[in-house]
From Swiss-Prot:
The lineage of its organism: Bacteria, Pseudomonadati, Myxococcota, Myxococcia, Myxococcales. It is found in: Cytoplasm. GO terms for molecular function: translation elongation factor activity. CDD domains: UBA_EF-Ts (cd14275). One of its GO terms (cellular component) is cytoplasm. This is Elongation factor Ts. InterPro entries: EF-Ts_dimer_sf (IPR036402), Transl_elong_EFTs/EF1B (IPR001816), Transl_elong_EFTs/EF1B_dimer (IPR014039), Transl_elong_Ts_CS (IPR018101), UBA-like_sf (IPR009060). The gene is tsf. Residues 82-85 are annotated as: Involved in Mg(2+) ion dislocation from EF-Tu. Belongs to the EF-Ts family. NCBIfam families: tsf. Associates with the EF-Tu.GDP complex and induces the exchange of GDP to GTP. It remains bound to the aminoacyl-tRNA.EF-Tu.GTP complex up to the GTP hydrolysis stage on the ribosome. Its main location: cytoplasm. It comes from Anaeromyxobacter sp. (strain Fw109-5).
């Protein structure tokens, strides 16, 4: 078994953001093997993730992501507990993944409890109305409507969306894995997504006018 020294503990802490004692114990349990030590931290972290979720997370990062071509931009705030973790490569990579997810999947809310009650009611009513002509019992309609509402959440709520890099995993699971690995509470607080020209009425011109303007024949 390899002897665990201070440099090893420091290196694992810098890589994972986990606490010093947690890193030391993980390295000892893994016999000095870094890959195994990371796995130990991850497994222990998963069990503690729920407890960490209630801890104050007031540090973190506000990050931006501009999609290729400059037509989509994202600002996102992701919080953690300490400035040390906020500066680690692992946390910053997570924030970048979250920003890219927002750019690609266009969520409207972070989590489902942020969806206004009137929006939820409207979605349920639309789902029921679509099925009423099939003359199904109201209880069945309610069940079908709830299923459609789940699909709505998966489309428009960030934490319910499939991760664009690994679609078998939800974004909430990506966050849970990060909490397990890093050892701190991590929360997506808010985001803004911008699309070039969104909401603007574009001026329509015919091809003849465009050609004339380009040739200097029309002012």
């Amino acid at each position: 078994m390899a002897e665990v020294n201070a440099n090893m503990v420091k290196e694992l802490r810098e890589k994972t953001g986990a606490g010093m004692m947690d890193c030391k114990k993980a390295l000892a349990e893994a016999g000095g093997d870094f890959a195994k030590a990371e796995e130990v931290l991850r497994k222990k972290g998963l069990a503690a993730a729920a407890k960490k979720s209630s801890r104050a997370a007031t540090e973190g990062q506000v990050a931006s992501y501009i999609h290729m071509g400059g037509k989509i931009g994202v600002l996102v705030e992701v919080n953690c507990e300490t400035d040390f973790v906020a500066r680690t490569d692992g946390f910053q990579a997570l924030v970048k993944d979250i920003a890219m997810q927002i750019a690609a999947a266009a969520p409207q809310w972070v989590r489902r409890d942020e969806v206004p009650a009137d929006v939820v009611a409207k979605e349920l009513e639309i789902a029921k109305a679509q099925m009423r002509d099939q003359k199904k019992p109201e209880a069945i309609l309610e069940k079908i409507a709830q299923g459609k509402l789940e699909k709505f959440y998966e489309q428009f709520c960030l934490l319910d969306q499939p991760f664009v890099k690994e679609d078998k995993k939800k974004m909430s699971e990506v966050l849970t894995d990060a909490v397990a690995k890093i050892g701190e509470n991590i929360q997506v607080r808010r985001f803004a997504r911008f699309v070039l020209g969104e909401g603007l009425e574009k001026k329509q011109e015919n091809l003849a006018e465009e050609v004339a303007k380009a040739a200097g024949l029309q002012k």
